[in-house]
C-alpha cells in the first residue's frame, strides 16, 4: 500500500491460509524537509518522496502503524507524509528500501546529483542502522 496499510490484514490472512509467511510493509511518503511544512515549489510533484518500510518483527509492525498514523495526523499535505526526524524515532524493527523512481535517492541520481544521493543514503543508513537500509535495483526500461 502507498501511505497506508489498508490491505495488511487481508493480505496477512490470505498468506497464512496458503502457508506463506507475510512480510507487512508500506511505501510511505517522506517530506523533503519537515512533515509540518505544508508548502512546496511545485505542489504535489515535490511534496514527498517514496520510501518502502518493511516490518522485521512485532516492534517494527507497531512502529510502522505509528509512522503511518503520524503521516495522516501530522504530515498530511496532498498525501500522508512522515519525515526523517519521526522515522528516526520509530525505526526499530523496520527495514527500509530506497524505493522506486519516485524515491529521494533515485530522483537525485536521475538529476546527476550523485554526491547528494550518497549523503541521503548515509542518512538513511544512520537512521535505520547498519542492516536496516537497502538500495533497490529496479529495471525501469530507461536508457
What does each model-found stretch correspond to?
Residues 2-143:
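Phosphodiester-processing cores and adjacent nucleic acid-binding clamps
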Amino acid at each position: 500500500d502507498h501511505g497506508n496499510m489498508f490491505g495488511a490484514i487481508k493480505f496477512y490472512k490470505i498468506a497464512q491460509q496458503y502457508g506463506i509467511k507475510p512480510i507487512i510493509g508500506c511505501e510511505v511518503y517522506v517530506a523533503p524537509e519537515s512533515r509540518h511544512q505544508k508548502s512546496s515549489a511545485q505542489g504535489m510533484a515535490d511534496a514527498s518522496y517514496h520510501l518502502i518500510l518493511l516490518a522485521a518483527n512485532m516492534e517494527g509492525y507497531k512502529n510502522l502503524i505509528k509512522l503511518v498514523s503520524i503521516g495522516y495526523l501530522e504530515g498530511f499535505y496532498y498525501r500522508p507524509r512522515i519525515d526523517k526526524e519521526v522515522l528516526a524515532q520509530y525505526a526499530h524493527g523496520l527495514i527500509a528500501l530506497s524505493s522506486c523512481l519516485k524515491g529521494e535517492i533515485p530522483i537525485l541520481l536521475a538529476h546527476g546529483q550523485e554526491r547528494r544521493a550518497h549523503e541521503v543514503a548515509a542518512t538513511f543508513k544512520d537512521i535505520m542502522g547498519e542492516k536496516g537500509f537497502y538500495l533497490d535495483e529496479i529495471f525501469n526500461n530507461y536508457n
